[in-house]
């Protein structure tokens, strides 16, 4: 198994509606990306978040699935409208 972890800082001016659209969009990737078996995303409640307000974990069956995730057309469609809204940090790991 492999995991993709992420956290986002919102850029100035991002609305609550846009934030909810991001959460919904990420959750909808599951079932559309081969090998993506679990998606957890939520609002950060930690006082140690350093400005990162949204975080999540995605679990993939294997390295090939993880590698195929980023260029997948469904993911790229999300990225096209998501990136102008966020300052992301990402970590991938084998578990």
Predicted regions and their residues:
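A common structural junction motif
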Residues: 28, 74-80
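Short S/T/G/P-rich N-terminal loop/turn motif that feeds into the first structured element of a domain
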Residues: 1-53, 61-71, 87, 92-95
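A cross-taxonomic marker for long C-terminal extensions/tails that follow the last structured domain
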Residues: 81-85
């Amino acid at each position: 198994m492999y995991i993709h972890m992420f956290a986002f800082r919102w850029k100035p001016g991002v609305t609550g509606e846009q934030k909810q659209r991001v959460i919904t969009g990420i959750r909808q990737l599951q079932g559309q990306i081969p090998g993506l078996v679990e998606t957890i995303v939520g609002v950060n409640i930690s006082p140690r978040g350093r400005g990162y307000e949204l975080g999540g974990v995605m679990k993939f069956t294997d390295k090939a699935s993880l590698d195929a995730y980023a260029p997948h057309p469904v993911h790229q469609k999300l990225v096209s409208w998501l990136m102008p809204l966020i300052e992301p940090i990402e970590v991938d790991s084998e578990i």
